[in-house]
A protein has these predicted regions:
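Short internal beta-strands
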Residues: 20-26, 63-66
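Short acidic-hydrophobic, aromatic-tinged amphipathic segments that line or gate anion-handling sites
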Residues: 83-88
Length: 105
C-alpha cells in the first residue's frame, strides 16, 4: 500500500504540472524491475509498477539507488526502459537546490 500511495501522489503532482524525480531504494526499487510481480490495488485495478510507468510517461525522472543493483541479482538490463541508476553526487546536488521538496515513503 505504501508504494501504491506514493505512486498515486506522484502522478497527482505530475498531473498538476510539477516536475517529479523518484529515487527508489531497497524493496521499492523492485518497482523498476521488468517482470516483477506486484499486487493489484482497487479501485484502480492497477499495480504500483503500472503507476510508475504512467509517472514516467508524464516525464518523471526515475532512478534506483546506486547500491541496489550491486546488492541484488538484478542488472541494469533488468530495469524498465528509462530507469537510471542514481549517482550519489548528482542526487546530493539536486537535494541542495532551493525549492526542492522531499516526500519519503
Amino acid at each position: 500500500q505504501t508504494q501504491m500511495m506514493a505512486m498515486v501522489l506522484g502522478n497527482q503532482v505530475a498531473a498538476k504540472g510539477a516536475s517529479v524525480r523518484v529515487l527508489l531504494c531497497d524493496a521499492a526499487a523492485t518497482l523498476a524491475v521488468q517482470g516483477a510481480s506486484f499486487p493489484t490495488f482497487e479501485p484502480a485495478g492497477r499495480t504500483p509498477q503500472d503507476l510508475l510507468r504512467g509517472l514516467m510517461q508524464k516525464g518523471a525522472t526515475v532512478e534506483v539507488c546506486a547500491i541496489f543493483l550491486p546488492n541484488t541479482e538484478y542488472e541494469s538490463s533488468d530495469l524498465l526502459d528509462g530507469v537510471g541508476v542514481a549517482k550519489p553526487g548528482p542526487i546530493a546536488d539536486h537535494m541542495m537546490k532551493p525549492g526542492v521538496r522531499y516526500f519519503t515513503f
